Amino acid sequence: MTGLYELVWRVLHALLCLHRTLTSWLRVRFGTWNWIWRRCCRAASAAVLAPLGFTLRKPPAVGRNRRHHRHPRGGSCLAAAHHRMRWRADGRSLEKLPVHMGLVITEVEQEPSFSDIASLVVWCMAVGISYISVYDHQGIFKRNNSRLMDEILKQQQELLGLDCSKYSPEFANSNDKDDQVLNCHLAVKVLSPEDGKADIVRAAQDFCQLVAQKQKRPTDLDVDTLASLLSSNGCPDPDLVLKFGPVDSTLGFLPWHIRLTEIVSLPSHLNISYEDFFSALRQYAACEQRLGK
């Protein structure tokens, strides 16, 4: 009887994987699926499979060897591999993809969710975005930078099945590790309102030094000169900002660097889904950026 239960479970698991693969393929091909319909399908699948899962689950036997638990881990690895393939295909399906994305939290009445922001960062990594800036005007994420990094690494392992210890990390554009976190193949910078102001102050100081050294004249200060001083750290300006919350403002997020940035507003970052995230990417890919013209 146990063998029959296991066979039924394997068949249902295979059907579920096939359903997800077909859904991903159709969404990439047509791009018009309603994400609410997907949520309903997932909820229905969970409702159907949950009782069976409880039926098939066996109580752990005392002294049983750990090798009997390899099947769930194998299933997790398969799911992670499926996620990687699906999300990478999503990124390649877009006409254009932001190189640098900003995540700006403007919600003031709710505590920010580290797990939801970590999910967004991992999704960015999966679709191929290279730089992420995480910002909240209260500086909560920056004060708890280590906690955010731990959550990102945890989500990376769970969603993508990647072990960050296998990669050689490099911190983006700073010598201060306390100001930044790094995810494999993705530079993540955690910012607060002081960072944007500090960048402008440093750029002004650098220009004054150039004038004092007679390498520049005071009249040489213009938009292009200031832009070059601010971008000298090697990180490109944000191409896209996802602003979460009802406030119609970025609340001091890199004021100079977002002159030409596309901004997409979302109601909240809490419980955000991958479909919401990818919908914002599709909106960015479809927009025509005039670059100030």
UniProtKB/Swiss-Prot annotation:
Name the Enzyme Commission number(s) assigned to this protein.
2.5.1.87
State the reactions this protein catalyses: n isopentenyl diphosphate + (2E,6E)-farnesyl diphosphate = a di-trans,poly-cis-polyprenyl diphosphate + n diphosphate
Q: Which InterPro entries match?
A: Nus1/NgBR, UPP_synth-like, UPP_synth-like_sf
Q: How does it sit in the membrane?
A: Multi-pass membrane protein
GO biological process: any one? regulation of intracellular cholesterol transport
Tell me, what controls this protein's activity?
A: Activated by phospholipids including cardiolipin, phosphatidylcholine, phosphatidylethanolamine, phosphatidylinositol and phosphatidylserine.
Swapping residue 197 to A leads to an effect described as: Decreases binding to DHDDS
Q: How does activity depend on pH?
A: Optimum pH is 8-9. Active from pH 5.5 to 9.3.
One GO cellular component this record assigns the protein to is:
dehydrodolichyl diphosphate synthase complex
Q: Please give the Gene Ontology molecular function terms for this protein.
A: ditrans,polycis-polyprenyl diphosphate synthase [(2E,6E)-farnesyl diphosphate specific] activity; metal ion binding
Which sites does the entry annotate for glycosylation?
144, 271
Its UniProt domain note says: Contains the RXG motif, which is important for substrate binding and prenyltransferase activity. The catalytic site at NUS1-DHDDS interface accomodates both the allylic and the homoallylic IPP substrates to the S1 and S2 pockets respectively. The beta-phosphate groups of IPP substrates form hydrogen bonds with the RXG motif of NUS1 and four conserved residues of DHDDS ('Arg-85', 'Arg-205', 'Arg-211' and 'Ser-213'), while the allylic isopentenyl group is pointed toward the hydrophobic tunnel of the S1 pocket where the product elongation occurs.
Query: What disease is associated with this protein?
Result: Congenital disorder of glycosylation 1AA: A form of congenital disorder of glycosylation, a multisystem disorder caused by a defect in glycoprotein biosynthesis and characterized by under-glycosylated serum glycoproteins. Congenital disorders of glycosylation result in a wide variety of clinical features, such as defects in the nervous system development, psychomotor retardation, dysmorphic features, hypotonia, coagulation disorders, and immunodeficiency.
Give the protein's biological function. Answer: With DHDDS, forms the dehydrodolichyl diphosphate synthase (DDS) complex, an essential component of the dolichol monophosphate (Dol-P) biosynthetic machinery. Both subunits contribute to enzymatic activity, i.e. condensation of multiple copies of isopentenyl pyrophosphate (IPP) to farnesyl pyrophosphate (FPP) to produce dehydrodolichyl diphosphate (Dedol-PP), a precursor of dolichol phosphate which is utilized as a sugar carrier in protein glycosylation in the endoplasmic reticulum (ER). Synthesizes long-chain polyprenols, mostly of C95 and C100 chain length.
Q: What name does the UniProt record give this protein?
A: Dehydrodolichyl diphosphate synthase complex subunit NUS1
